[in-house]
Regions:
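Short alpha-helical functional segments enriched in proximate histidine and acidic residues
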Residues: 97-98
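Non-catalytic, C-terminal membrane-associated alpha-helical segments of glycosyltransferases
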Residues: 105-196
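Conserved active-site beta-strand element of glycosyltransferases/polysaccharide synthases
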Residues: 25, 43-45, 51, 60-65, ...
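Acidic/histidine-rich catalytic neighborhood
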Residues: 85
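A structural signal for well-ordered alpha-helical segments within the folded catalytic domains
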Residues: 45-49, 88-93, 127, 131
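Acidic/His-rich active-site region of diverse nucleotide-sugar glycosyltransferases
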Residues: 1-42, 48, 57
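Short glycine/proline- and charge-enriched loop/turn segments
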Residues: 7-10, 35, 70-80
Length: 196
């Protein structure tokens, strides 16, 4: 996203957690199965939510370096909206997505981390955090209906999913991201673990 496509780190096919909505292609069968973007999200975290549902339904999300995307028009939302509104949408949608997509044990494990995250976020965007929490309380029945649909179609458990998206790209990718990436593709552990 907004980087030089000729950079070596972008020339490796990778299984990824989420694709950008403006540069995403989906199988029709996947759309028929999991649906499209959540209509209640408006913007922010909508493609991550969709990709999470795809993973749970048994699909993979893959970054393909040979693809070419022409993004005809873009709007800088930071110029169009106040930061507090942007953060509100981001917090709001993130909470709703976790409630819909994560298993109950994963939600319980993540809950203390989220509480800490939102506690510190309150220092910067108190209104945004409060509005996000109120919205999710108000929308809780609707979110639970969506959750039932997602969980009914689940084919992948959270443990397997997290191992996949944390392993691929593997940790060494991030090492090369901050160091020299020219040898990344020749890393033996990557060649052995990436099977597409």
């Amino acid at each position: 996203y907004r980087k030089d496509a000729r950079d070596p780190k972008y020339n490796t096919r990778l299984t990824i957690n989420s694709a950008k909505g403006a540069a995403m292609m989906l199988r029709r069968s996947a759309i028929d199965r999991v649906g499209t973007f959540d209509e209640d999200f408006f913007i922010y975290f909508e493609e991550t939510d969709l990709c999470h549902k795809l993973w749970l339904a048994g699909y993979k999300v893959i970054y393909e370096p040979l693809s070419v995307v022409y993004h005809y028009e873009a709007v800088d939302t930071h110029k169009q909206m106040r930061n507090s509104f942007i953060m509100y949408l981001s917090y709001r949608n993130r909470i709703a997505s976790y409630l819909k997509n994560l298993s109950v044990p994963s939600i319980l494990r993540l809950f203390p981390v989220l509480c800490l995250f939102y506690f510190f976020s309150c220092a910067l965007y108190p209104t945004a955090v409060l509005r996000a929490l109120v919205w999710n309380i108000w929308m809780f029945p609707k979110t639970m209906n969506k959750r039932r649909l997602v969980q009914r179609g689940r084919k992948l458990d959270d443990t397997t999913l997290f191992q996949t998206i944390w392993r691929d790209p593997p940790l060494i990718y991030y090492y090369y991201l901050f160091k020299s990436l020219k040898f990344y593709r020749h890393e033996p552990s990557l060649v052995e673990t990436n099977h597409y």
